[in-house]
UniProtKB/Swiss-Prot annotation:
Domain of life: Viruses
Record has Hydrolase as a keyword: yes
Name of this chain's protein: Putative helicase L115
Database matches in Pfam families: ResIII
Gene3D superfamilies the UniProt entry points to: P-loop containing nucleotide triphosphate hydrolases (3.40.50.300)
Residues annotated for ATP binding in this entry: 885-892
Top class in the EC scheme: hydrolase
Organism taxonomic ancestry: Viruses, Varidnaviria, Bamfordvirae, Nucleocytoviricota, Megaviricetes
GO MF entries: ATP binding; DNA binding; helicase activity; hydrolase activity
Keywords, alphabetical: ATP-binding, Helicase, Hydrolase, Nucleotide-binding
């Protein structure tokens, strides 16, 4: 919501402006045009220069060749206009129809135009252009825009009498903001990051109240689970689309080429002419080319009952296969052409899901298939020429809501059937041997070259088609007529003249047209059935080679039929993958083991019910402490334990809805919602008093007592599915559509030697690595590449088969909910039994013995405290921890000490330590730390080749994310350590998937980063999931999760930091400039931007800083300080270096200058310095900056930071923000609006 812009009344005496009343006569609706103004005092040239040189980036109009582009921001939009997002990225191509008028946004270009008109004393035009009613409104709009959109405006247009808040949102809106009007979706767009559509095809024609409401609906899509909110799809930078309407009159239209298409005596005649014909024609235009046609002769509107989606992609594939297989496919050719022509418009996947006419695709793919799979030709009868075909393509590309008339459709059939009929070796033109033409102009002397030129210049096509047409254009041969079947007429053919057909060819075309181009899921279904061998990419190539590509004209024998592939094709042809989710009513519920909740279960369930943050006295509060001190209060930026009754009683009583909150493992919620409250300092659930940190009253044990053994059939079925060998498609479909009436114990009946444990691992991981309890298999695109999520290229299809099996075994737990995906219910007995069964398979083995490593270096107190905390939590059943201690606090040594402790105390089947690094740079650091501080570790480097040999009890493997992705190590680790864990934020990356697998199968996990959560919550979400806290990974539980699973220590001994603040002074001139901005009536955000610009860019300020910095360095030198001085930029570093005679890193001297960019991360050779001199940095960078000095090799225990700030300026606000960044629990970024406020107004941060 935009803020109301307020304005102080200017008390200066207003001077009247001479206005010519004649200039005002054209706009009688203006209320206040004759009011006196002070425009004569305005220096418009200066104001225009201000806009030209100091407009903020988002308020600058987008131009091309010095002309404004046709986007909504520049032009606005009228009702029924269509707009499309043409910016590359995840929302590319999404389009809408505008249902309410939108004003053009106020950009630098528009404001300059208004100012130039005012300079000419033209007052009427600005009011008309901006649709304003008075000069007072104009002053308000201009003044407020200049205040907010520029950095050096001098308040010269502040003479308005009152505020007009109804214009505030318009004034502040920029091109990246969502449209605030009703829209109708017209294009589903193409997600260039995933290869899928932006929104589903069935959203077409859906109406939304605004861009924001459409974005909110997008956020609910399965493909956006775990992703940041949609914000930049339906926005003002969308391009206004030209209306592809038919033109009735071209008398005054410029063109270079004019074609006419006529249907005369049952034959289509296309000609390039020089003069416009007088007969009534309709026209479509492409740049310098116009095509005339009689609409009623060639096109007719599609019937309204034709809206049911048809699989046009499948029909187009069938059209191509019909031509490739030759003359005995005439029957299916006719049927296919009829089906395509009758189909509604659809979204073309290979062209970014662009909305296209099915009739256009009919003639376009016919044109391409004839050239690619047959040969160019000249006509000899009533068949269409290549020029006829491409002109029909261009007409239907503009006229989307039409289909071909029956007469013209008959000619299209004849043309396709003639190409199909010409199926000998001599009918396959070898276009591949030709060279691509660089230029492809229209050639009036050659219809053939003209057709190809029109195609290349005006049709969006696949790159392979482009290359083919450019090669074909270079051909200068005399082409032959098509051979014709015998008929009574020498010239005219009908489709009925093509009578050759046989059932085998018909069936072959019907099935081979179902391939990876139109049905990408076929890749995963095929992979599900064959032994583990081919990746999805290899299967894509295989299907093309074995099934799709065969052309009878090659003279080669058709490949033997792959029976597995044929069965999958039959399945896709005849059966829907949708199944009934009705569960067998006779399914048995088992009696349960009444398992007593352990401490972790009790605490977790309580935190789910009571643990979300609330407010008391303006402070953040959590019921996440200890039994003695149950509440945590955020006081002075630090969480403090308390038992204050007033704070505890302030808990807001409320319902907790548990329907979508997963219970602790082994239990289910007894109800879908619970009433929680605190009465007299005691927690109550549904009116019953419970102990602090024991929410087990809301839980019911669901661990089933299963005694029934698995029969031989089911054992054989499970073994087959998990073996990695052949699975019959019929078996997969059978288990998909059936369910066992009861849970059976199946693990002990199968032989581990007969199953592929990698499939078990991947199945186990899929169950945990899901969002909103939806298990997603694939999808992949037609080339076998991933789309929305990371996939296992070798096993993804097998996983689809296995989850169908699990649905059969646990029908109340896993259910198919789409062609590939499955829903998961974790509050069932089946879920508990399934997880325990998989774990029984995975975690088998003998207890580990062997050498135990030791730590040879004494730990700092905070390191020992961290180790003790983690070990205690691990003992209580926790899986993962995050170590967010400061840079230089020794996190590496802490993790090694933890590893040694765990190895010493645990000797079960888990063994070895895996260290995952983001890249190669940290490998040497880890090797050095192990050598310096430990004994008896068996250190192994995971080399790119993969194998690391035997993993012993004391083995520590150092690997990188990339190596783990390419050559994963399958092992049950005792501990996985992920250093710089921000590298596993992207859930769609395969390396993140592998990191998740390693951590899930490990007994324990530690994730390390001093800037652990410096990121958006959607990125944080995946790392929280890896920790497996048992708490909901939702924003309202964020602080609770952190309190439970993050340690953040600052060394309490050893190196100590002393911080001093030196105040530099502004001189009188710069102080006056500063105060002038302070006095402006601006939002604090805009004011901060202007003040910052002054302090950064003003030369007088920069020179003054250099002088005072020189004195500071001289004084510090006398005190024995060796200074590392941080500059904002390279330019500032050079300025300081030249004036202070101090080298810039990597050169070093008694002092050294480094930029924030170069000197924040990774530099380990600066420990010769003991003092940091800098302006207050951002909280994100401070820990890393301090870590350049406070690290091994530093000989000084007393280190210093000398902050220099300009007194009574916004730089003091930076100091206040740093107060909340000394420890991790303080390191949440201050809300930006609050930061601006404290910086500008010097308020104390609360």
């Amino acid at each position: 919501m935009s803020k109301t812009i307020t304005k102080k009344v200017n008390k200066k005496t207003k001077k009247s402006t001479k206005i010519n009343p004649k200039k005002l006569a054209k706009k009688p609706i203006i209320k206040s045009i004759d009011k006196p103004t002070n425009l004569t005092d305005v220096d418009f040239d200066k104001l225009i220069h201000t806009v030209e040189t100091s407009t903020k980036r988002h308020f600058i109009a987008i131009e091309f060749n010095k002309k404004p582009v046709n986007n909504i921001a520049n032009l606005g939009a009228k009702v029924n206009q269509k707009a499309r997002l043409e910016r590359s990225g995840e929302y590319y191509g999404i389009g809408v129809e505008i249902l309410e008028t939108i004003r053009p946004l106020l950009t630098n270009r528009l404001i300059i135009k208004i100012l130039k008109l005012l300079k000419q004393e033209n007052l009427t035009s600005p009011l008309k252009i901006l649709d304003l009613n008075s000069l007072d409104e104009l002053h308000y709009v201009l003044h407020c825009w200049l205040e907010n959109a520029t950095t050096v405006y001098d308040d010269c247009l502040n003479s308005y009498d009152k505020s007009y808040p109804e214009y505030d949102q318009w004034i502040r809106t920029v091109r990246s903001d969502p449209l605030n009007c009703k829209v109708r979706l017209t294009e589903i767009g193409f997600n260039e990051k995933t290869g899928g559509s932006v929104v589903p095809a069935d959203w077409i024609d859906g109406e939304f109240d605004s861009g924001i409401s459409l974005h909110k609906e997008m956020d609910k899509l399965e493909t956006r689970i775990g992703k940041p909110p949609a914000t930049y799809a339906i926005i003002h930078s969308m391009m206004i689309q030209k209306q592809d309407s038919i033109i009735e009159d071209i008398t005054n239209t410029k063109f270079d080429y004019l074609f006419y298409v006529d249907l005369i005596d049952n034959k289509l005649v296309s000609k390039l002419v020089s003069k416009i014909r007088k007969k009534p024609y309709q026209y479509v235009k492409y740049d310098n080319t116009i095509i005339g046609f009689c609409l009623e002769d060639i096109l007719t509107t599609k019937s309204q009952n034709n809206k049911k989606p048809r699989e046009v992609g499948l029909y187009v594939s069938r059209l191509q296969k019909s031509i490739r297989r030759g003359r005995f496919g005439s029957q299916i050719m006719r049927e296919t052409i009829d089906a395509i022509n009758e189909s509604p418009n659809y979204n073309l996947p290979e062209h970014g899901f662009m909305r296209v006419s099915a009739s256009k695709q009919l003639v376009w793919r016919l044109f391409i298939s004839i050239l690619e799979d047959c040969r160019p030709y000249v006509t000899s009868g009533n068949e269409l020429s290549l020029l006829d075909l491409i002109l029909l393509v261009l007409i239907t590309q503009k006229c989307l809501e039409y289909k071909f008339t029956d007469n013209l459709l008959e000619l299209i059939k004849v043309t396709a059937l003639m190409a199909q009929y010409n199926d000998t070796k001599s009918d396959l033109f070898d276009w591949r041997k030709f060279t691509e033409s660089i230029k492809t102009p229209i050639n009036p002397k050659s219809d053939y070259h003209t057709a190809i030129s029109l195609a290349l210049g005006n049709v969006i096509m696949m790159s392979g088609d482009t290359r083919m047409l450019k090669k074909l254009y270079s051909v200068n041969l005399v082409f032959k007529e098509f051979k014709r079947p015998k008929c009574n007429s020498l010239l005219e053919l009908t489709s009925s003249n093509f009578k050759l057909t046989d059932q085998d060819t018909y069936q072959d075309i019907m099935l081979t047209s179902i391939d990876h181009h139109c049905k990408p899921n076929i890749i995963l279904y095929y992979q599900a059935c064959i032994p583990v061998s081919l990746t999805t990419r290899e299967i894509s190539s295989y299907i093309w080679k074995i099934s799709s590509s065969y052309n009878i004209r090659s003279g080669k024998t058709q490949n033997n039929i792959d029976q597995v592939l044929r069965l999958v094709q039959n399945f896709l042809l005849e059966k829907s993958t949708k199944v009934s989710n009705e569960i067998n009513n006779t399914f048995l519920n088992y009696s349960c083991n009444e398992i007593e909740p352990d401490n972790k279960t009790r605490r977790t369930s309580f935190l789910i019910l009571f643990g979300s943050k609330y407010k008391f006295g303006g402070k953040d509060v959590m019921l996440a402490g200890t039994k003695k001190n149950p509440v945590k209060i955020k006081t002075k930026n630090e969480w403090v334990y308390s038992k204050d009754m007033a704070v505890i009683n302030a808990y807001p009583k409320k319902y907790i809805y548990t329907k979508y909150l997963d219970p602790p493992f082994g239990f289910k919620w007894t109800k879908p919602k619970f009433w929680t409250e605190i009465i007299d300092g005691k927690p109550y659930v549904d009116g019953t008093n419970v102990d602090f940190f024991d929410g087990s009253i809301a839980l019911k044990s669901i661990t089933p007592l299963v005694t029934k053994k698995c029969n031989k059939y089911t054992t054989s079925l499970i073994t087959t599915f998990f073996s990695g060998l052949d699975i019959e498609l019929e078996s997969i479909l059978d288990v998909r559509n059936k369910s066992k009436p009861q849970i059976v114990n199946w693990v002990n009946t199968i032989d581990l030697n007969d199953i592929d444990l990698e499939l078990v691992r991947c199945t186990y991981t899929k169950i945990f690595n899901q969002f909103n309890n939806t298990i997603m298999i694939g999808p992949c695109d037609r080339s076998g590449n991933k789309m929305h999520n990371s996939i296992n290229y070798k096993l993804e299809g097998k996983l689809w088969a296995i989850f169908n099996l699990l649905h059969y075994l646990y029908p109340k737990t896993i259910n198919p909910n789409s062609a590939l995906n499955f829903s998961l219910n974790r509050s069932t007995q089946g879920y508990i039994h399934l997880i325990k069964s998989l774990e029984q398979l995975l975690f088998v083995g003998k207890n580990i013995t062997g050498l135990v490593p030791t730590i040879s270096t004494k730990l700092w107190d905070h390191q020992q405290e961290t180790v003790n905390t983690m070990v205690a939590k691990f003992t209580d059943g926790y899986h993962g921890f995050g170590d967010a201690s400061d840079v230089g606090s020794g996190k590496t040594l802490t993790s090694l000490a933890l590893a040694s402790k765990l190895i010493n105390t645990i000797n079960d089947i888990h063994s070895g330590i895996l260290v995952l690094l983001p890249g190669n740079k940290l490998i040497v650091t880890w090797q050095d730390e192990i050598d310096k501080h430990t004994k008896n570790f068996d250190v192994k480097l995971h080399k790119p080749s993969g194998d690391i040999g035997k993993i012993k009890r004391n083995t520590i493997v150092i690997s990188t994310m990339g190596r783990q992705r390419d050559n994963p190590i399958n092992h049950k680790w005792l501990l996985v350590i992920i250093d710089e864990c921000l590298s596993v934020q992207n859930k769609n990356a395969l390396q993140t998937e592998q990191a998740f697998i390693q951590s899930l199968l490990a007994k324990y996990l530690v994730m390390m980063s001093a800037t652990f959560f410096r990121t958006r919550f959607d990125k944080l979400y995946y790392m929280l999931k890896m920790l497996q806290t048992g708490l909901p990974e939702r924003k309202q539980y964020l602080e609770t999760i952190l309190a439970e699973s993050i340690v953040a220590k600052v060394p309490l001994s050893g190196m100590k930091w002393t911080t001093n603040i030196i105040h530099f002074q502004l001189n009188s001139l710069t102080r006056e400039l500063y105060n002038k901005i302070i006095d402006k009536d601006l939002s604090v955000e805009a004011k901060y931007a202007k003040l910052n610009s002054l302090l950064v860019n003003n030369k007088e300020v920069n020179n003054m800083v250099v002088k005072q910095l020189s004195k500071l360095i001289a004084e510090l030198t006398k005190q024995g300080c060796k200074c590392l001085i941080y500059a904002r930029s390279q330019d500032e570093a050079k300025l300081w270096s030249n004036n202070l005679k101090i080298p810039i890193y990597p050169k070093k001297g008694d002092h050294c200058i480094v930029t924030y960019h170069d000197g924040t991360y990774g530099l380990n050779d600066l420990v010769i310095y003991n003092t940091i001199v800098m302006r207050p940095p951002t909280p994100d960078s401070l820990p890393q900056i301090k870590g350049r000095l406070a690290r091994p090799g530093q000989k000084n225990n007393n280190l210093r930071i000398e902050y220099f700030v300009l007194e009574d300026t916004i730089e003091e606000g930076l100091l206040i923000r740093l107060e909340i960044a000394s420890k991790f629990v303080h390191q949440y970024i201050m809300p930006l609006a609050k930061f601006y406020n404290i910086s500008v107004n010097h308020q104390k941060y609360k």
